[in-house]
Amino acid sequence: LSLVGSEMCIRDSNYMDVKPDSNRPSVAYFSMEYGLNHVLKIYSGGLGVLAGDYLKEASDSNVDLCAVGFLYRYGYFTQTLSMDGQQIANYEAQNFGQLPLDRVLDENGKQVVVDVPYLDYYVHAYLWRVNVGRISLYLLDTDNEMNSEFDRSITHQLYGGDWENRLKQEILLGIGGILTLKKLGIKKDVY
């Protein structure tokens, strides 16, 4: 039994050293949410759990994949009920310093900023990284002093706000995601 355990530890320690299979196309995966762990509140349910499972399986299957999404300040709400049975949505701010993620830094040690065009101005998003096995998940965060209060809220809540904010989220994910990969020098075969 201990020999089997030792062999498994050796095999698992080499797991992360294996390079992606270059015979398969490389992939850039974009999603509004990723269900990786309850600690990181960047998902609400089915789509997020599925997207998170894709990343975990890509890592296990040695697929050359990276992903882009959002680092939500408040995530999705937690639900409580009032005395008369009405739903109450509670939003709790995430403390990014206590989450399993890292700031993406440039060669000067400054956090990387992605500048995303919106009509006649730019929204500026900080870049964070979560390691999902061998897979890098890059998260965009607009809650910073470079943006107006209105644009800081783009990444406050998953699916939160009005239709305009939702459209801004979709622009940030699509255009901002491509700009993120370009800024990091990442090129993939399939998007």
Short names for language-model regions:
Residues 3-10:
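Short, small-residue-biased leader/transition segments that mark boundaries at the very start
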Residues 13-15, 44, 84-131:
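Extended, Lys/Arg-enriched charged tracts that mediate electrostatic binding to polyanionic substrates
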Residues 37-68, 147, 154-191:
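A conserved hydrophobic secondary-structure block that centers on an alpha-helix together
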Residues 31, 67-71, 141-142:
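Glycine-rich, histidine-containing beta strand-loop boundary motifs that form or position
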Residues 56-100:
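Hydrophobic or amphipathic alpha-helical targeting/insertion segments
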Residues 20-38:
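Structured, charged N-terminal subsegments at the starts of enzyme catalytic cores
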Residues 108-179:
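Active-site cores of enzymes that catalyze phosphoryl transfer or operate on phosphate-rich substrates
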Residues 34-39, 72-78, 145-149:
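Flexible loop/turn segments at secondary-structure boundaries
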